[in-house]
UniProtKB/Swiss-Prot annotation:
Name of the protein this chain belongs to: Elongation factor Tu
Reactions that this protein is recorded to catalyse: GTP + H2O = GDP + phosphate + H(+)
Its biological purpose: GTP hydrolase that promotes the GTP-dependent binding of aminoacyl-tRNA to the A-site of ribosomes during protein biosynthesis.
Organism: Blochmanniella pennsylvanica (strain BPEN)
Main location as per UniProt: cytoplasm
Renumbered residue ranges of the record's region G1: 19-26
Residues that bind Mg(2+): T26
Length: 394
């Protein structure tokens, strides 16, 4: 069966669900596709179709990111259902990087929980520009004052992490009731879709900048070659163009022989779109997650840089004790984690939780990098800091 061409009519926006485990992120994702498909066409996706990787089923928690698509009155959305469990924040960092805006799900029955806070912090550090709050499970709360209290707490929490808490849309709903076709609660999903259309501005796509795509996954397709997938960070890739694979290993040149999105073929892929890129003559083992595809000559791999870093305090889920020079955590860049060693500025012997500090980092492998690139610092499965590359040394 030949693949159908993707029709590019409405503006395309990337969003996703974030929030504490079991607050209803995946149920809400299913409810959005179900309610909007009835009104604007498209496909409804059931809860278990979204929550579908085998390891997710076994533990009843979402580990991998699931992509769904839907239409509103004015836009086409690609939606990522992000992992919610603390063990899997590693994936959250790569998933949340794919958002023009996030839908933060908080259960009205619980209010904000530790992961609610952690996800807001992560959204801040991976550069998610806008958050909309969906207060879920409101059908289970009869007390109006309690709902107002949760709403107030959410606004304060968002403001604490430099999001405009006072102006953030907060929709009170019930994803489960909306899935069950309850009209009152289905209308809340439409209210959410209006908030998406009106509150998340159409991003200024960086299509005019040189092409860059952080690689998330690599597949081998028999008879066609190697396909890499990811979200185009900037620029445009056209079929037939020469590109470079940069980072971790030696840089290699290749040619793009195909671009596809949601299993439909495109002549080109643009900034902000999740695509698969087919590479000519590239072997599956020559390319890996964490590298980037780039316009030749525009980005170089580096392993030694100066950075501005914030180290979380223990109340934010960070370390309880200081660390010293020579400390070796993991640094998460775009889609990958690389071990690195730190050097502290002269006169600084140690770094306390809660400190903001300039540090020099030596990575064990080079990463495609420019000034201004953001990263997370992790150890033992938890985020302990956030940083930005302020100056490349080598």
């Amino acid at each position: 069966m030949s693949k159908e061409k993707f029709k590019r009519i409405k503006p395309h926006i990337n969003v996703g669900t974030i929030g504490h485990v079991d607050h209803g992120k995946t149920t809400l994702t299913a409810a959005i596709t179900t309610v909007l498909s009835k009104k604007y066409g498209g496909y409804a996706r059931a809860f278990d179709q979204i929550d579908n990787a085998p390891e997710e089923k076994a533990r009843g928690i979402t580990i991998n990111t699931s992509h769904v698509e839907y239409d509103t009155a004015y836009r086409h959305y690609a939606h990522v259902d992000c992992p919610g469990h603390a063990d899997y924040i590693k994936n959250m960092i790569t998933g949340a990087a794919q958002m023009d805006g996030a839908i933060l799900v908080v259960a009205a029955t619980d209010g904000p929980m530790p992961q609610t806070r952690e996800h807001i912090l992560l959204a801040r550090q991976v550069g998610v520009p806008h958050i909309i709050v969906f207060m879920n499970k409101c059908d289970m709360v009869n007390d109006e004052e309690l709902l107002e209290l949760v709403e107030m707490e959410m606004r304060e929490l968002l403001s604490q992490y430099d999001f405009p808490g006072d102006n953030t849309p907060i929709i009170r709903g019930s994803a489960l009731k909306a899935l069950e076709n309850d009209e009152i609660w289905s209308n809340k999903i439409l209210e959410l879709s209006d908030a998406l259309d009106n509150y998340i501005p159409e991003p200024k796509r960086v299509v005019d900048q040189p092409f860059l795509l952080p690689i998330e996954d690599v597949f081998s397709i028999s008879g066609r070659g190697t396909v890499v997938t990811g979200r185009i960070e900037r620029g445009v890739i056209r079929v037939g163009e020469e590109i470079e694979i940069v980072g971790i290993k030696d840089t290699i040149k290749t040619t793009c022989t195909g671009v596809e999105m949601f299993r439909k073929l495109l002549d080109e892929g643009r900034a902000g779109e999740n695509v698969g890129v087919l590479l000519r003559g590239t072997k599956r083992d020559e390319v890996e997650r964490g590298q980037v595809l780039s316009k030749p000559g525009y980005i170089k791999p580096h392993s030694h840089f100066e950075s501005e870093v914030y180290i979380l305090n223990k109340d934010e889920g960070g370390r309880h004790t200081p660390f010293f020079k020579g400390y070796r955590p993991q640094f998460y860049f775009r889609t990958t984690d690389i071990t690195g060693t730190i050097e502290l500025p002269e006169g600084a012997d140690m770094v306390m939780p809660g400190d903001n500090i300039r540090m020099i980092v030596h990575l064990i492998a080079p990463i495609a990098m420019d000034d201004g690139l953001r990263f997370a610092i992790r150890e033992g499965g938890r985020t302990i800091g956030a940083g930005i590359v302020s100056k490349i040394i080598s």
